[in-house]
Amino acid sequence: MGQGKSREEKGTNSTNRAEILPDTTYLGPLSCKSCWQKFDSLVRCHDHYLCRHCLNLLLSVSDRCPLCKYPLPTRLKISTAPSSPPPYEE
């Protein structure tokens, strides 16, 4: 007992995580490409954005996006959205 080797811990690779945008009002007219209504909590798919609701619905059906045919994002990272405009400089 106790002879087995412990597994190596795999670090989470942040390069394969999709970016989630909590609020996209500062980016201009971005919306979910599936429902075309939501503009908050958008997740970047290959070349478009999906809201989290549509992403969950699409993941329950398949692991590929029906719009771009690429794999749907399953790992997310929170982006740092600006909370205020940059400071005024003279």
UniProtKB/Swiss-Prot annotation:
Tell me where it mainly resides: virion
Q: Where is this motif: PPXY motif?
A: 85-88
Q: Where is the signal peptide?
A: none
Name its GO BP terms in alphabetical order.
viral budding from plasma membrane; viral budding via host ESCRT complex
Task: Supply the InterPro entries for this chain.
Answer: RING_finger_Z_arenaviridae (IPR024183), Z_RING-type_Znf_sf (IPR038485), Z_RING_Znf (IPR003224)
What Pfam families does this protein's entry cite? zf-P11
Q: Write out the entry's keywords from A to Z.
A: Host cell membrane, Host cytoplasm, Host membrane, Host-virus interaction, Lipoprotein, Membrane, Metal-binding, Myristate, Viral budding, Viral budding via the host ESCRT complexes, Viral release from host cell, Virion, Zinc, Zinc-finger
Give the superkingdom in one word. Viruses
> Which compartments does it reside in?
Virion; Host cytoplasm, Host perinuclear region; Host cell membrane
Q: Which cellular component appears as one GO term in the record?
A: host cell perinuclear region of cytoplasm
An MF annotation (GO) of this entry = zinc ion binding
Topology in the lipid bilayer is annotated as:
Lipid-anchor
Lipidated positions per record (N-myristoyl glycine): G2
Q: How is it modified after translation?
A: Myristoylation is required for the role of RING finger protein Z in assembly and budding.
* KW Zinc-finger (keyword) present: yes
Keyword Zinc on this protein? yes
RING-type zinc-finger residues: 32-68
Q: Which family does it belong to?
A: Belongs to the arenaviridae Z protein family.
Domain free text: The RING finger domain is essential for the inhibitory activity of protein Z in transcription and RNA replication.
The annotated subunit structure for this chain is: Interacts with protein NP; this interaction probably directs the encapsidated genome to budding sites. Interacts (via RING-type zinc finger) with polymerase L; this interaction inhibits viral transcription and replication, Z partially blocks the product exit tunnel for the releasing nascent RNA product. Interacts with the glycoprotein complex; this interaction plays a role in virion budding.
**Miscellaneous section:** Inhibition of host myristoylation by the compound DDD85646 leads to proteasomal degradation of protein Z (and not lysosomal), strong inhibition of Z-mediated assembly and budding, and reduced levels of viral replication and transcription.
Tell me, in a sentence or two, what this protein's role is: Plays a crucial role in virion assembly and budding. Expressed late in the virus life cycle, it acts as an inhibitor of viral transcription and RNA synthesis by interacting with the viral polymerase L. Presumably recruits the NP encapsidated genome to cellular membranes at budding sites via direct interaction with NP. Plays critical roles in the final steps of viral release by interacting with host TSG101, a member of the vacuolar protein-sorting pathway and using other cellular host proteins involved in vesicle formation pathway.
Protein name per the record: RING finger protein Z
Organism, by scientific name, is Lymphocytic choriomeningitis virus (strain Armstrong) (LCMV)
